[in-house]
């Protein structure tokens, strides 16, 4: 599962979602991408399951870029524990998704295969997404 090796602070404050993501909203590496429409918390297991679906369909033909990494710790207190006594221990790591963020990028494959792979991967994610592609201007 994805987790950071070292953090400046062991526990963070609660994540607040912003309106729209200006950073990471365009394609940087590949020709096709999966863009988030909604906002949610994304953990390492969800990223890994989506990556497995994409690599199963694309195989070794194309290149996959993952643009998100769960680096925010999520704390949780054990069950049957009374309130108080400090913040709970770190349970998992998340990434806060804002609308407009590109999560995965694909290159080196044809459009139909890329669309199939990214649409199947979107079923593994807890928010709605859309398929985007790089627009090329030829004169």
UniProtKB/Swiss-Prot annotation:
GO terms for cellular component: cytosolic large ribosomal subunit. One of its GO terms (biological process) is translation. GO terms for molecular function: rRNA binding; structural constituent of ribosome; tRNA binding. The keyword Acyltransferase does not apply. InterPro entries: Ribosomal_uL16 (IPR047873), Ribosomal_uL16_bact-type (IPR000114), Ribosomal_uL16_dom (IPR016180), Ribosomal_uL16_sf (IPR036920). Part of the 50S ribosomal subunit. NCBIfam families: rplP_bact. Belongs to the universal ribosomal protein uL16 family. This is Large ribosomal subunit protein uL16. It comes from Neorickettsia sennetsu (strain ATCC VR-367 / Miyayama). The gene is rplP.
């Amino acid at each position: 599962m994805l987790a950071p090796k070292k953090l400046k602070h062991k526990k963070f404050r609660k994540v607040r979602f912003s309106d729209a993501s200006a950073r990471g909203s365009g394609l940087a590496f590949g020709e096709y991408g999966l863009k988030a429409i909604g906002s949610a918390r994304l953990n390492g297991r969800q990223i890994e399951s989506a990556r497995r679906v994409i690599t199963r369909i694309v195989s070794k033909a194309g290149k996959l870029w993952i643009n998100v990494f769960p680096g925010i710790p999520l704390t949780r207190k054990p069950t049957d524990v009374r309130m108080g006594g400090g913040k709970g221990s770190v349970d998992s790591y998340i990434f806060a998704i804002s609308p407009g963020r590109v999560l995965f990028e694909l290159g080196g494959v044809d459009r139909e295969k890329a669309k199939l792979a990214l649409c199947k991967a979107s079923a593994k994610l807890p928010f709605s997404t859309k398929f985007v592609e790089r627009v090329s201007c030829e004169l």
